[in-house]
């Protein structure tokens, strides 16, 4: 094993340290025998030319200088800035003055860019409000109206109003929005539901998929594919008929399955992996293999300590962001070290459950429209996926779903992602019963269910609990007849959120729930955010079902 640091001997240049604490995995020696047909990075079909460049692409060495110098505490701040003039003119000016003795990078940025608008100070919580009243009054605070696209800004304009999570997140996010919508429906905000439905359909039409969020730097990846669940919600709440979205669902499916038909066993392309028996399963992916604009310095530091080619690490970090679980022991080879991330080598249980739902939704809506051939085709696809999941991702010995390391050909860790097959109706009753026992003994706490069993310092691990996981567990177990467990999780979670609200008068992104004393969840690449979209949505829906805690 190598363990050394390489330092630049020239003191006038930037010091470079590379941690080579890396031992070649014997399984990786086999990779040359596997053909992974990776696409060229930065190839995004259907992307309008005016929005093709991310801030890192547009500002080149200026972008790297700003991020490396840490002139903003949050790496996301500069990518969210909008230029006051043509970016090319800014870059030319920067190149002319950057070596001047009195050059001030912070002043240069402030003179040439509009800093992101901060909304958090606009709202002061009323301690007299109940939890329900607090959430209902927050919807307008978290709503952003459509606006003209500021030239060369990273923010992608949307045609209708939308909800943002809150805090540092001033754009809409794909899978967050579904859980936010649950609360909007409960609050009677059908107007916002319609707007968000139109926005997501518009993004599919214009970009061929729903990006991670409405920023140029998010266009190279998506997030957990929950549009089929959104469509189901629209239908249930009378917002929009499901039939009108059939073409959009098919387009999203094509995005996730791109390249599948040309793969041979043990081959992967973008999101698709052909398993040894010829079946198809999916993984998370990002078409770029560069540091994320919004976490540029953090990614560079992580890659520096990996001992692997940086582009591989960047791809896995980006794919981890696409998973929504950024980050978790689920994606780490060494659970205590983010630099060991291997997201693209895992077949995630939640992703494949969501795609099962997508296939089933296309089949169901096709049946409503009398498209029998399409219905039959997608019923077969859903059935084939369920069979493949049971072969590769179901741990029969322990009665749990687990992710699958397709390169090592072995099961990976157990986490709360295992409840998604129940939420989408993919499990059988025996699997649901056995999984319930595992969740009770391994993930359930007096505060809700943990993201995982492992304490790694990452935010999607123990001791944290997250609203979307609670909702899917509650509804998933109740769908299979385990009302006792579903209701217990619901009561525990409502108690957690309400107790914290009574003390702090706010809802937050994640909660520390391991010891029965609710407090702020830790971990992650950024400070804890309050607001918070999907917590508000899930809790508001639960209040409608269970009453105020």
Swiss-Prot record:
Keywords: Cytoplasm, Glycosidase, Hydrolase. One of its GO terms (cellular component) is cytoplasm. PROSITE patterns: TREHALASE_1, TREHALASE_2. PANTHER family: CYTOPLASMIC TREHALASE, TREHALASE. The active site is at residues 326, 509. Its main location: cytoplasm. This is Cytoplasmic trehalase. It comes from Escherichia coli O1:K1 / APEC. Pathway: Glycan degradation; trehalose degradation; D-glucose from alpha,alpha-trehalose: step 1/1. Hydrolyzes trehalose to glucose. Could be involved, in cells returning to low osmolarity conditions, in the utilization of the accumulated cytoplasmic trehalose, which was synthesized in response to high osmolarity. It catalyses: alpha,alpha-trehalose + H2O = alpha-D-glucose + beta-D-glucose. GO terms for molecular function: alpha,alpha-trehalase activity. Belongs to the glycosyl hydrolase 37 family. Signal peptide: none annotated. Monomer. GO terms for biological process: cellular hyperosmotic response; trehalose catabolic process. It comes from the Bacteria. Its EC number is 3.2.1.28. It is found in: Cytoplasm. The keyword Transmembrane does not apply. Substrate binds at residues 168, 175-176, 212, 221-223, 292-294, 324, 525. SUPFAM superfamilies: Six-hairpin glycosidases (SSF48208).
